[in-house]
């Protein structure tokens, strides 16, 4: 029920929370030089920014029905470190699209920090996400606000280590 520019769609419309290709309608011409990447999971997030970047406007509608069936064997349910690392890389690519200004969106950035913490916990790999201070903490709520404060104090590397330690300690106490 709204018309967005690509920047508005990704930030105000929070497209990063629903970046699935299957529940959208596209003009055929958008796919002339855009393809879903082979060998990557979460391929929708790799592709949707390219498609929206070729569009002047994006329309959304509140009418319709999307019947999603949970698949316990699907990628969302079974993703491990390797798959979440691909998701993280797709988000890092998305933040590189300056015209979308995603890197300036504190809520989005902290969501990507969460993915980075999961990747570190599952793989032990050093963070790939470029850490930065979150200046607009006041826009965040609850756990995201606390994590942003901790990110600003500790930095990303040590926030990842603290997160891993807390999860390990919690499992030991259970």
Where are these regions (language model features)?
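Amphipathic alpha-helical repeat scaffolds of TPR domains
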Residues: 108-118
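Donor-binding/catalytic cores of nucleotide-activated saccharide
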Residues: 1-58, 70-80
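Alpha-helix N-cap/helix-start motif at coil-to-helix transitions, marked by capping-box chemistry
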Residues: 20, 25, 62, 85-88
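Structural motif
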Residues: 100-109, 144-149
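Catalytic core of nucleotide-sugar-dependent glycosyltransferases
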Residues: 65-72, 78-105, 119, 124-137
């Amino acid at each position: 029920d709204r018309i967005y520019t690509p920047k508005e769609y990704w930030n105000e419309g929070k497209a990063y929370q629903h970046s699935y290709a299957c529940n959208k309608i596209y003009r055929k011409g958008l796919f002339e030089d855009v393809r879903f990447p082979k060998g990557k999971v979460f391929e929708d997030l790799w592709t949707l920014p390219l498609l929206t970047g070729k569009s002047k406007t994006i329309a959304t509608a509140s009418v319709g029905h999307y019947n999603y069936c949970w698949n316990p064997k699907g990628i969302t349910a079974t993703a491990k470190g390797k798959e979440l690392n691909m998701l993280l890389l797709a988000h890092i690519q998305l933040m590189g699209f300056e015209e979308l200004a995603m890197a300036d969106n504190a809520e989005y950035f902290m969501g990507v920090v969460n993915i980075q913490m999961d990747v570190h916990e599952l793989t032990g790999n050093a963070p790939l996400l470029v850490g930065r201070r979150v200046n607009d903490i006041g826009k965040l709520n609850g756990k995201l606000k606390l994590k942003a404060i901790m990110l600003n104090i500790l930095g990303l590397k040590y926030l990842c280590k603290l997160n891993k330690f807390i999860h390990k300690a919690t499992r030991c106490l259970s």
